[in-house]
């Protein structure tokens, strides 16, 4: 119950489709719906809404119709490892000298998001190589983000920028610095990966959630250990989930399980994950109530992603 006596809505459980890479996208969505997930974080890649495939428009329309029938919402994720370069993981990035292909890909991803009715597109900075000066990398990133925000404004999409361990922007402080460089643009929001908070942030995970709330538009979740960037199934890491999920109470955007390395047992892992999260969320409400409850995040994008 909230402090006003009104029961807080359930969190919007979602699953990242990179964890179902061995499934056709429509099959993955049906399975997730059957398990009780209300959202899908769709990773654009060769097998799932390939942004360069012939017939993309028809496939997007087909998936949009399926999402409607299943009553599911969507976020577009862009973390495919070899989507743009078959030999170099995640290349090029927004801080590469040859960033044009990444910018074009992200622009296409926003168009797909708009056609699906998905209000958020996820993105990240990239790894800074030793031969690139720090100030050059930050200047490139800010410049490319400014251009992407122009497209986002035109299409009505909010960017959900993810700090990623080992990349130029790897923590909340880095995100806040970049957002300040962009003038606090209302469509520049945060994708918070709960495991990353455990991995490298100085504060405890629940405190990271509370710090993130003013910018929060998308959440990725999995277990993790301190100092080790490895996405683990729930219960295999060190995170105390009830207070973390209690801190998210009232947040309406996706809370999306990200276990891309568990495709070999995707349906079973997805089932275990939602069972764990529901139990931990109930325990969080029982122990912590709704103190520190979430708002809508940037540009209202904490609201449920969907077509209608």
Annotate each predicted stretch with a short phrase:
Residues 48-51, 85-88, 129-134, 198-200, ...:
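A short acidic, helix-capping loop that chelates divalent metal ions and anchors anionic groups
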Residues 16-20, 45-47, 79-81, 126-128, ...:
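Active-site beta-loop-alpha junctions enriched in small/polar residues
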Residues 3, 26-27, 68-70, 83-189:
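Active-site acidic/histidine proton-transfer and metal-coordination neighborhood
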Residues 43-64:
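Glycine-rich, proline-tolerant flexible connector loops at the mouths of alpha/beta enzymes
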Residues 21-32, 43-46, 87-92:
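Alpha/beta catalytic barrel-like cores
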Residues 59-70, 141-151, 208, 243-247:
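Catalytic-core regions built around general acid/base machinery
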Residues 75-77:
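Conserved alpha-helical segments that form or flank metal/cofactor-binding pockets of metalloenzymes
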Residues 2-14, 21-38, 68, 103, ...:
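Histidine-acidic metal/acid-base catalytic patches
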